[in-house]
Amino acid sequence: MYSEPKQDRSKATEEAFLSALDTLLVQTSFKNLSIEDIAREAGISKGAFLRRFGSKRQALYVLYDRYCEKTVVVMDRIVSELPLKEQATESLFDMSKSLERLIKEDYSCNRAMREDFQENLEVHPSTRRIFLYCVEIMRRTQKRFFGVTNETGAYSAAQILITNTFEYVFNAMPGLPRDYEQRHKLMAEILLVALQAGDIGTSK
C-alpha cells in the first residue's frame, strides 16, 4: 500500500523515481517500460522502487495525481474569473485552451494513463474528480449567463470538452481546425450549444 513519504530521504527517493518515470515516458510507452528501466534511469535500486511504490502502475498514479493537482489550480482560476467574463463563450474559450495546454505539458503522463485505462477499463479516482469539477464549472457557467442550471447541459459540455480535447492532443481528430484561435473559438461555440442541451427539442 502506497503512502506519501515523510522523511527527506524518502521524499528525495520518490522524486528521483518519478523524474525518471516522466523522462522515460517521453521515449517509450508505459506498457514497454520496466521497473528495471526506471531504477536504472534514477540510479537507485529496483528494490527501493518496489518498497516506495509497490508497482509500476502505482508510480504512474502518483505522477498523475501531481498533474491533476495542477489541473485543479487552473480550474480554480477559471471559476474565480467567471464573474469577470461578459459572455459565456469567453469563459468556454478559456477552458478549452487551458485544458489543451495542460494535457500537452504533461503529454507523456496523460498518454500513459490513457494506456492504463484502455488496458484495465478502470477510471482513476482523480480523473473522476476532475470530470465532476468540470461539470460543476459548467453549472456555474450556466448560472452566470443563463440564470438557471440543467444537468444534461452541464454533463454534456464537460464530456465534450474533455473527450474532444484529449482526442485532439493525441492526434485522433485531424478534422478540427489546425489554427489555434479558430479551433478554440469553435469549441467554445460547441460548448455553448451543449450547455443548453436540456432546452433543445422543448417548446412552450
Region roles according to the model:
Residues 1-12, 199-204:
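N-terminal intrinsically disordered/low-complexity leader segments
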Residues 10, 14, 64, 68, ...:
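Amphipathic, non-transmembrane alpha-helical scaffold segments
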Residues 12, 16, 24-58, 62:
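Helix-turn-helix
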Residues 35, 65-72:
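Short, basic, alpha-helical segments at the C-terminal edge of helix-turn-helix-like DNA-binding modules
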Residues 62, 66, 76-105, 157-161, ...:
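Hydrophobic alpha-helical connector segments
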Residues 72, 76, 102, 120-146, ...:
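Amphipathic alpha-helical packing segments from all-alpha helical-bundle domains
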Residues 98-125, 170-174:
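Amphipathic alpha-helical segments used for helix-helix packing
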Residues 143-190, 201-204:
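Hydrophobic/aromatic-rich alpha-helical bundle segments in the mid-to-C-terminal region
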